[in-house]
Amino acid sequence: MRKQQEIVSSVKKWAQWWVLQRKKKLEEQLNETMSINPFLMPFLFDYHDLKNLDELVDLIIASHLMTGHATGFGKLIDEKILPNVFGTKKLDSSFRKISPFNESCFDEIDHLIVREDGRKQLLSLKAGRWTIQLTMAVQLNASFKDILEKHADSVDDIVVGVFYGTSEELTDKYDILRGINRGANHSVTDLTDSVSVYAGREFWSWLNYGENCTQEWVLQGIIEALNEERIHETATELLSKFKASVVQKYESDIKNGDSMSWFKLLSKING
């Protein structure tokens, strides 16, 4: 089990790295073209009761960056924090060359965890409650069945982990992947003895041998990284430059006096 200070300091280190990566991405955005959906803009303008182009650009940039933040944070957890803080073995491209992990049934497995007592657990990491759809749930059930039947020497059990939220909030797809049918009868095998689903606090506790405070320690590391990096001091200026460049690019094509010319914007983007 990892102790509090070990987790906090390690998470802080990788969170600092990630914060600098996000800053670098923002700097790169200044010289890139942001994709804008001209058909969506009138809806956003009306739905959010926006008053001018500046407010619309603020909304577009926030949405654009939020997608990158969410994706980047998922990679931070998956590729940096789990392997480097909690000692999991990430099934990267090199690891997947090793038998039996080169077989297709392991495609949705992200980590191998070898516990202190020698137990081998496989982790399929998911970002949230909506990550799994019906087709994937059925496919996961089939893949997990193959792993448990054909590679019992390589794994003792399988966990599907969701790093935020609660198990009660998950969709029924997380039951289906374990072989539990709710309502409609799907072609799945009961794997409830060997496949578990943990979300939120339960996931972080399971990861760290039952320590209930693990998620607080992870968050503490992130907060300490932010306090030290003070990213807002540079991000504010970069965001202002980004906004100014977007406004300048579209101002003549979207403004028609005091109103917005959506057809001019459509023509600029789509030709």
Language model regions located:
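Charged, structured surface patches that assemble and position nucleic-acid processing machinery
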Residues: 173-271
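A short, terminal or domain-edge coil/loop segment
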Residues: 54-55, 60-61, 150-167, 216-225
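Catalytic centers of nucleases
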Residues: 74-145
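Short, structured coil/loop segments at alpha-helix boundaries
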Residues: 1-8, 106, 113-115, 133, ...
